Amino acid sequence: SKYDEVKHVDLLKEGKYPTFFEDDLCVVVCPSFGGRLPYTCAERLRHLRANNAIVILVCVYGNRHYEDTLLEMKDICDVCGFTCIGAICAIAQHSIIHEFGENRPDAQDKKELLAFMEQIYLKGDREIEFVPGEYPYKPLKNFPLHPYADKHCTKCGVCVEECPVGAISLEDMKDCDSDICISCMRCIAICPSKARKNNPALVLSTKALIKK
């Protein structure tokens, strides 16, 4: 197969953006935040140059709804020069309210994802024109959840290094810059001391908002 060589490109941090070519097959994976692409994902996707490379889109959402995310991904990838041959919405545990999509993806999810990929493979390189979503896209919503560090923080700096938008500084690792933070919860997920958390009252209000 001409796709035997696999290369992982991490766009979590700004940096060098790859250029793709017609013989490449790309799988672009993005999260859905409140039914939209996080603005940082949209900005970084726009830097890609595809030159008619084939793309399969994967939108990961926390078992609420992905709404306009997949359409937004496709619109951006079309402008970048990708040829979209497939699109998948995959459920994962919600990054804020863990009881939504808890333990997902599970074995059945993985089985279905493999089946979807096989369908796309058998379909061949025929471009798809339609994916779910509406334009204009729904407004972007900012959740007022900005993680902070408790007394267990060891100041190891992992959160500073791994924050995709640079919202945590070495000078003050306890808090984050609420003007920059996108509430992705990466710092909570990767903290080796489990020292980062959200305001519990705000988590409860966010849960109620998501349930509506």
Protein language model features and the residues they cover:
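Iron-sulfur cluster-binding cysteine motifs and their immediate structural context
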Residues: 149, 154, 158-182, 186-203
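FMN-binding flavodoxin-like domain, especially the glycine-rich phosphate-binding loop
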Residues: 1-12, 17-30, 34-142, 201-206
